[in-house]
Amino acid sequence: MNAGQLPPELQRVHMVGIGGSGMSGIARILLDRGGLVSGSDAKESRVVHALRARGALIRIGHDASLLDLLPGGATAVITIRTAIPKTNPELVEARRRGIPVLLRSAVLARLMDGCTTLMVAGTHGKTTTTSMLVVALQHCGCDPSFVVGGELAVVGTNAHHGLGACFVAEADESDGSLLEYTPNVAVVTNIDSDHLDFYGSVDAYIRVFDSFVERFALGGALVVCNDDPGAAALARRTAELGIRVLRYGSDDRIGETLAARLLSWEQQGTGAVAHIQLAGQPNSRVMRLPVPGRHMALNALGALLAAIEIGASTDEVLDGLAGFRGVRRRFELVGTSGVGQASNSLVRVFDDYAHHPTEISATLAAFRIMLEQSGGGRCIVVFQPHLYSRTKALSREFGRALSAADEVFIVGVNGAREQPLAGVSGASVAKHVSVPVRYIPDYSAVVIEVAAAAGPGDVIVTMGIGDVGLLGPEIVAALRVRANCNTPGCSGVLQ
């Protein structure tokens, strides 16, 4: 099959859970390639509306009859292993009719056939690194196809069918999906402990990355962050297999050479400037990023090496990274409001996807530097734990990470695919937080309390997977109401 063509079974599909970040990206590629797409989802959303506008037939709720939304019915049904139960009526009906039920990851692998495939794997930073790579390649004129787990600010979408020879995507390890792929180049950002509800042990989780590397296309290359112990260990094991390894980071290890070295890094507000050294080049280079955080600089190095590996110009990649405007729900500014008459009374409200202790620590470190550079203010976090199993296993670690904030509000757990566990709630995390903390499961109440707690110069961050991100605009609105009511003569709205 040539790149850009759809196999017969993917020309008329029904997607269960079409509004999810991964599923919606697949839907966009199928539609762009001329396929007919129907789907179902649990609720209306901005993503669902956008897919309808592109021609998808979508219904809210789940019913066996939805397999007949398309003329002639669906020739395949696409789903996600961990998100949709086998008892879903559409899946039950598909099996009854003998319609193939395909996993999202298998469909993505089919869509990448015939392309030079670049993938990003790792516990943290996949979406941002993948997005950086996409933006860099677009700046180089490559027009890659891509599917990303978040919406790129610069293009306003999470997927695109490009005219170039490259396909860029995330390799999701949460349910072993990354073993569907045979990349030409893969970046591994880090290997932490996660998704133990699926793997059962840390060792099993680590081993899936080794299995991923063993599936590389002939002549494939691994780009790996040498600063992360888990990723560095994978690099050593991979090199022993005879697979080419390109390391990046700032951490020297005996007998290992860095292909890209982070010499220095300085955060400047919500951006950063780094000095880097590429192996074989006599002079260091400046890498400018419009996003903060040392972890973001490391992600950019991984994207840089992957792009160079397929022939992109270093100068053009660096220029492209300088224009990277971030990903939706990653350090995203939601809005601002004044809470007084003083010039420094501005309160900024951000939204961030961080949902693991390691991610929370890195994100809050960037916010702390930003606050110090802007003259002070507190960091107030509204956190939503994700999954009961993860909350139970990592409640202490969550508490320690969140304690880097000045004040914390915790809402109810986003259980997603899981049933509640007895004794596990946001309070399980709250008891391990060492700064002022309140567990308030009611969203309306938490909006009021957070708006009342904010002071001049503060930053408020809604954080986590799930619908906690919807609270940001409500908090901004509540701050503006507070400013209008409590400060005579002041509009309370600073743009």
Swiss-Prot record:
Pfam families per record: Mur_ligase, Mur_ligase_C, Mur_ligase_M
Organismal lineage: Bacteria, Bacillati, Actinomycetota, Actinomycetes, Mycobacteriales
InterPro entries: Mur-like_cat_sf, Mur_ligase_C, Mur_ligase_C_dom_sf, Mur_ligase_cen, Mur_ligase_N, MurCDEF_pg_biosynth, UDP-N-AcMur_Ala_ligase_MurC
Gene: murC
Organism (species): Mycobacterium leprae (strain TN)
Name of the protein: UDP-N-acetylmuramate--L-alanine ligase
This protein's pathway: Cell wall biogenesis; peptidoglycan biosynthesis
Record keywords, A-Z: ATP-binding, Cell cycle, Cell division, Cell shape, Cell wall biogenesis/degradation, Cytoplasm, Ligase, Nucleotide-binding, Peptidoglycan synthesis
Function in brief: Cell wall formation.
GO annotation, biological process: cell division; cell wall organization; peptidoglycan biosynthetic process; regulation of cell shape
EC top class named in words: ligase
